[in-house]
Amino acid sequence: MQTAEIELKFPIHDLAGLQSRLPGLGFQLGTPRTFEQNTLYDTPSRTLRAVKQILRIRHYGDLWIVTHKRPADPAADGDPARSGDRLSSSDAAGYSAAASYKVRIETETLLDDGPALAAIFHQLGFEPVFRYEKFRTEWSHATPTIDGPLFTNPALPAELPIGRHLVLDETPIGDYAELEGPPAWIDRTLARLGVDPATCLTDSYGSLFLDWKQRTGSPVDNLTFDEIPTTASLLPRFP
């Protein structure tokens, strides 16, 4: 399925407190806290990174999911200055955008056998370049259609569906929330949650990982609980 992905992240300092408020704001729990493993693939010459695309296999609970993401504006492909990427020697870099909202076209589908697809990727010349893990809790919001146009960027296909979701991610380097939906709904939800828009981010987890490495001097290569042990990794992986 292909969808328009419009989202913002913000750091969470009180995960339990935030979750306790969500039902009163019209959110419904979609998926309880579930362990998630992600692997990004690219060619040895980083062909996908050069055009701001990602190819990912995700293991989410019992599910395997393959995802491709690309910029909503083809003119931004391959232009680090426009996309806001900070390229470096790390394979985690180059998979983020910087704007008021992060806007991507996402195509994904469920898999029966993730390792089999990984083997196919290998035969086609794609190799694992970055791994990241988190515990994710998914909430959805049933909002009446009062937001007006979902998005006015002519580069974004108008026929693509846009949901309204909030996900809570517990990563080895901190907790983050992602709001995904029409910009008007995102802005209204941030206000209802009391989140300062100045604290919001469009960085990918790869970029957040690089920032963390620069601050800490850590030599690790992946954003995983094995490489960055935290108390979160000691909690049950499935509720």
Regions found by a protein language model. Name each.
Residues 1-80, 87-163, 199-239:
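N-terminal strand-loop-strand beta-hairpin
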Residues 5-7, 173-176:
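Phosphate/nucleotide-binding catalytic core
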Residues 12-15, 182-186:
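Helix N-cap motif at beta-to-alpha junctions
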Residues 59-61, 172, 183:
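A generic beta-sheet turn/junction motif
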Residues 83, 87, 192-194:
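Edge beta-strand at a domain terminus
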Residues 108, 178-180:
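Active-site scaffold segments
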Residues 166-173, 180:
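A contiguous pocket-lining binding segment that forms or flanks enzyme active sites
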Residues 184, 190-201:
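A hydrophobic, small-residue-rich beta->alpha segment in the mid-to-C-terminal subdomain
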